Amino acid sequence: MSAHCQVTGRKPSFGKSVSHSHRRTSRRWNPNVQRRKFYVPSEGRTITLTVSTKGLKVIDRDGIEAVVAQIRARGEKI
């Protein structure tokens, strides 16, 4: 499962870990993504999305129908 939100487009960010002796090593911060199933009434079926926790709040605010329309407008297949 890739760490990529289908709703917000959030991806991992990159940076450095700094130890006590100030040695820097590369690391990445993954977004908190989860696979969730949502029922889409207009299609009469459930869809599975990989969403971040912020994406879940967007779905609660805008509704699953509007979010699915935005994802399809970007060209992603669901």
From Swiss-Prot:
GO molecular function terms listed in the Swiss-Prot or TrEMBL record: structural constituent of ribosome
InterPro entries for this protein: Ribosomal_bL28, Ribosomal_bL28/bL31-like_sf, Ribosomal_bL28_bact-type, Ribosomal_bL28_sf
Family stated for the protein in its record: Belongs to the bacterial ribosomal protein bL28 family.
Stored Pfam families: Ribosomal_L28
GO cellular component terms listed in the entry, alphabetical order: ribonucleoprotein complex; ribosome
Region (Disordered): 1-29
Protein name: Large ribosomal subunit protein bL28
Keyword Flavoprotein applies: no
Alphabetic keyword roster: Ribonucleoprotein, Ribosomal protein
Keyword Lipoprotein in record: no
One of the GO biological process terms: translation
Disulfide bonds: none
